[in-house]
């Protein structure tokens, strides 16, 4: 979206990023008409627009190819008439003044044009020839309208460029106070340059608790120690009573696990597509992790089929009662449920599905195990169904959780005991029942949702110190909710927690505190004693 001298410009890809985009213009933002720009939109998926200042005649469009053509970079385009006509600048065949092995040309999107996209025009340049671009791993700059380019930053250190995190999404050039600042927003936060791109700093991020947490685990032997899996910021650890979470493993961080046994400390972290790394000791530094071995013949990481895995890798940690040895964990791919009994050194499938009716959904908390034993395991399937076993995986049943008002999109299962289960939905709308409950081991289901907000639920947690199974906590997109009557009524729980998306919950066996991780506002504790 950008405003030029002809009015507002906007681009739309009608079927996500798999259909040619359309450029629209509007004089007032109310009525819109298509702009014929075939050289710009043909074969395009996502398009990002930029102007130096509202009302400019010069506009830029940074264009990715449709994802059925690879989601790579199509080109950068310039318009000199407010958006009626566009000229391609030929970035994919243009070498920067400082090329390297990764970037011999100015192709910056790296096959992720659907995701990482940034273009900003320097408003202090009256010719509008100074432009900054960002893609997957790096940024670049031109001062002559795209004729020549220079690479500015890279996520990787081997190319001798200043560091800025990967995946660029937004930028601004500010001249407020008479001092020019270039600011770029990435998956790793905010990066600033005070010298027009020569050097960069990330110090404005210091002190901000704003990582996007997918999952969280707490040490069974030291409840103050916490692991978190972060969106594109790896696995981080808090060791002891501190506010600092240090990086323990890089890349995308998804499911994490930490044994609840007080006598045998093991831990797991994960990357994409079934890549689970593991530690047989307190994982307080990166060198204590062991990476999985990949078998090319079977496409497996220590037994987990990477070719069947989702981008997100979930991990379920049993209770100390169920696993006193502290070495058993569970995960899943699209059609398999896996178990390890040696803390991640090897995995074996305990369920293997082969049809769409038995696919397991790709969610952060898609597999769960009973707090009583290791035989009762469940995984959320498609169409509002769940997969259940009560004999450790020798036999499975597929049960529907659908009741009037509940349409599925199940995200999380909470076992209160071997008979009482709760299932939550992450459906963004169109239903009135967000949680369903079974008291007969999953054979039948009933609504258990009154009082919950009409927003997705990421995780359910049954209080381990309530043997009746009536106390359950819900991590919703609007904070934490609790029921103490088995789902007959829910209410928002606890004071002080921001009303934001809660991604995971933890409670020790004695129920002394509740810990919540959020998608952008850190980790929070609430004492219950």
Please place each PLM-identified region on the residue numbering:
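Beta-propeller blade termini and top-face loops
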Residues: 1-529
């Amino acid at each position: 979206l950008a405003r030029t001298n002809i009015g507002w410009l906007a681009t739309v890809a009608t079927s996500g990023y798999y259909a040619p985009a359309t450029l629209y213009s509007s004089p007032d933002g109310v009525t819109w008409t298509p702009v014929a720009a075939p050289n710009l939109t043909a074969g395009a998926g996502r398009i990002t627009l930029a102007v130096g200042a509202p009302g400019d005649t010069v506009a830029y469009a940074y264009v990715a190819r449709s994802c059925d053509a690879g989601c790579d970079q199509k080109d950068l385009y310039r318009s000199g008439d407010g958006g009626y006509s566009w000229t391609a600048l030929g970035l994919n065949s243009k070498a920067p003044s400082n090329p390297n092995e990764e970037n011999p040309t100015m192709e910056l999107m790296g096959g992720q044009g659907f995701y990482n996209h940034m273009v900003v025009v320097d408003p202090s340049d009256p010719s509008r020839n100074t432009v900054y671009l960002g893609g997957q791993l790096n940024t670049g700059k031109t001062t002559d309208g795209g004729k020549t380019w220079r690479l500015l930053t890279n996520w990787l250190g081997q190319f001798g460029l200043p560091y800025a995190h990967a995946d660029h999404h937004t930028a601004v050039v500010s001249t407020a106070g008479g001092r020019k600042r270039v600011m770029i927003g990435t998956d790793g936060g905010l990066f600033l340059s005070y010298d027009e791109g020569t050097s960069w700093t990330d110090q404005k991020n210091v002190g901000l608790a704003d990582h996007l947490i997918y999952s969280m685990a707490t040490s069974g032997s030291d409840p103050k120690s916490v692991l978190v899996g972060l969106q594109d910021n790896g696995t981080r650890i808090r060791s002891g009573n501190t506010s600092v979470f240090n990086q323990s493993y890089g890349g995308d961080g998804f499911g994490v696990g930490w044994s609840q046994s007080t006598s045998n400390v093991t831990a797991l972290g994960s990357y994409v597509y079934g890549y689970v790394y593991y530690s047989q000791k307190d994982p307080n530094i990166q060198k204590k992790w062991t990476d999985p071995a990949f078998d090319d013949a079977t496409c497996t990481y220590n037994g987990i089929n990477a070719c069947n895995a989702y981008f997100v890798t979930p991990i379920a940690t049993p209770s100390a009662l169920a696993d006193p040895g502290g070495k058993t964990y569970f995960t899943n791919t699209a059609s398999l449920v896996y178990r390890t009994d040696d803390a991640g050194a090897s995995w074996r499938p305990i369920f293997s599905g082969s049809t769409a009716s038995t696919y397991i959904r790709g969610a952060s908390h898609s597999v769960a195990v009973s707090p009583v034993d290791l035989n009762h395991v469940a995984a959320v399937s498609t169409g509002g169904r769940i997969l259940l076993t009560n004999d450790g995986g020798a036999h499975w049943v597929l049960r529907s959780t659908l009741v009037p008002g509940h349409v599925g999109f199940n995200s999380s299962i909470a076992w209160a005991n071997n008979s009482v289960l709760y299932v939550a939905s992450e459906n963004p709308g169109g239903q009135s029942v967000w949680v369903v409950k079974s008291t007969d081991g999953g054979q039948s289901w009933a609504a258990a949702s009154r009082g919950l907000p009409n927003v997705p639920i990421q995780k359910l947690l049954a209080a381990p110190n309530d043997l009746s199974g009536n106390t359950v906590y819900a991590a919703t997109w609007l904070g934490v909710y609790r029921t103490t009557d088995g789902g007959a009524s829910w209410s928002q729980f606890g004071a002080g927690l921001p009303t934001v998306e809660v991604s995971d919950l933890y409670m020790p066996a004695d129920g002394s505190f509740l810990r919540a991780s959020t998608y952008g506002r850190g980790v929070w504790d609430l004492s219950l004693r």
